[in-house]
Amino acid sequence: MCTLGHKPDNSLVSNAFGFLRLPLDFMPYDGDADWVITGVPFDMATSGRAGGRHGPAAIRQVSTNLAWEGKRWPWNFDMRDRLKVVDCGDVVFSFGDAQEMSDNLQAHAERLLASGKRCLTFGGDHFITLPLLRAHAKHFGKMALVHFDAHTDTYAHGSKFDHGTMFFHAPNEGLIDPQHSVQIGIRTEYDHDNGFTVLDAAQVNDRSVEDVLAEVKRIVGDLPVYLTFDIDCLDPAHAPGTGTPVIGGLTSDRALKLVRGLQDLDIVGMDVVEVAPAYDQSEITALAAATLALEMLYIQAAKK
C-alpha cells in the first residue's frame, strides 16, 4: 500500500498515488508483477469533447473508494492476495507529439510483455489501443478483440491519429481477426461488412447476460483476447464524463456482469479509455471506469 510509513489507510480520499493504492514501480520491467497499470494522458485524437488526458488521474483518485474492501463482493476474495499488480505511472511523451506518444507506449508495452508482465492501461482517448495492439500482436500473434463501445471505431476516413479508426487499421495490419472479434454496445452508424460481429446496445440490453456471453465466447473461440472498454459504452446516465456520449447505452450493472462473465477467455491485455472528468457528475464516470478496471483484474485473479 502506497502510504507514508507504509501504514494502512482506509480513507476514501487520501494517498491516491497509484490505482487502488497499489505499489508504485516506475521501473516495472525487471520486477515480479503479474499485471502493470499504465496511464496514458493523451487526447489529441479526440473528435468530440477533449479532456480524456485527465482520465488516468481521475480513475486513480476515485479508486480510493474501492481500496478499502478486502474480500470484494461478489468474489469473496481479495485480488491482491492472488495477483501482484503495480502502477508504473504514466507514459512520458512531449506535449503535442502524438507520434512520440504512440511510439513510447508501444515500446513500453513491448518491454513489459517481453519480461512476462501483462498490461492494464488507462486512457486517454481510444486511439491508445492501436499502439497497444501492435505491441501485443508482436508477442501473442493475431488476437481476438472484445470491444465495449458506443462506436465501432472502424471508420476509414480519419486522420493518422483518430480515435475512430483504430479497428479499421488493426485488422489491416494483421493485429486482430475480425471474424473472431465482437463489438458490444454499439449504437451509432457503422460499416456492416467489415467482418466484426456487432452486438448493438438494444439487443445487449434486451437479451440475457448469459445469452450475450455465450455468443461472445462462441465468436472468440480459443484465440488470445485483447479487452478494451470505452466508457461511452455506458449510457450517459451512468457515465456522462466522456467525449462522445450517446444515449441508449448499457447500465453499469449490465457492463459489470458482462465483464465478470469473460473470466474463461484468454485475456492477454486490457484497457479502459475515454474518461473525461471535466464533464463528469459526482465522479460517477471515473468510478464506473475504476470499478470496471478492478473487475478486469478480478477475472484474472479468479484463475489463480
Curated annotation (Swiss-Prot):
The reaction(s) this protein catalyses: agmatine + H2O = urea + putrescine
EC number: 3.5.3.11
Keywords of the record: Hydrolase, Manganese, Metal-binding, Polyamine biosynthesis, Putrescine biosynthesis, Spermidine biosynthesis
Keyword Hydrolase: yes
Classification via Gene3D superfamilies: Ureohydrolase domain
MF-aspect GO terms: agmatinase activity; manganese ion binding
Pathway assignment: Amine and polyamine biosynthesis; putrescine biosynthesis via agmatine pathway; putrescine from agmatine: step 1/1
InterPro entries assigned: Agmatinase (IPR023694), Agmatinase-rel (IPR005925), Ureohydrolase (IPR006035), Ureohydrolase_dom_sf (IPR023696), Ureohydrolase_Mn_BS (IPR020855)
Binding-site positions, Mn(2+): H126, D149, H151, D153, D230, D232
A single BP term in Gene Ontology: putrescine biosynthetic process from arginine, via agmatine
Function statement: Catalyzes the formation of putrescine from agmatine.
HAMAP family cross-referenced by the UniProt entry: SpeB
UniProt-recorded name of the protein: Agmatinase
Lineage: Bacteria, Pseudomonadati, Pseudomonadota, Gammaproteobacteria, Enterobacterales
Gene: speB
